[in-house]
């Protein structure tokens, strides 16, 4: 599939980057590979921070799911640490933010409503976006990869299947 090979392995910059960029001195026809990873360079070291496909764009603003999940993690003790999936779904005019969070071990579902309000307030304040839906689910209900990482895209597909 030549078009997929072109898209992945033969990318070029549409225009030169500003002076003092990491690409300074690279030939005009230099190529780069589109891995789909997001990263940052600190002290000449590259750190992978996420996946482009997981980036949440609402009303033209980028939101990193890890940042939203961090906020949720600290918004309520009712939520199981590191068991949160934030993702976007299509809305009528703009994408909508959805948050799935696992209830912590030993917590009663009767505390869900209070936790949801705390999460909504924290995310709205910290990120300037109001979640369209927040669901608190049982422990281990959110899909994970074989290495134990939250599988956001799988969680999104499951959510959309339930919503239909």
Located regions from the model:
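General helical secondary-structure elements
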Residues: 18, 49, 57, 116, ...
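Small/flexible residues
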Residues: 18, 24, 53-55, 63, ...
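Conserved C-terminal "lid"/linker of ANL adenylate-forming enzymes
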Residues: 82-88, 98-99, 120-164
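Surface-exposed acidic, glycine/proline-enriched linker/cap segments
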Residues: 9-29
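Noncatalytic linker/hinge segments flanking ATPase motor cores
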Residues: 26-29, 77-79, 138-143
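AMP-binding/adenylate-forming catalytic core of the ANL superfamily
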Residues: 2-11, 29-127
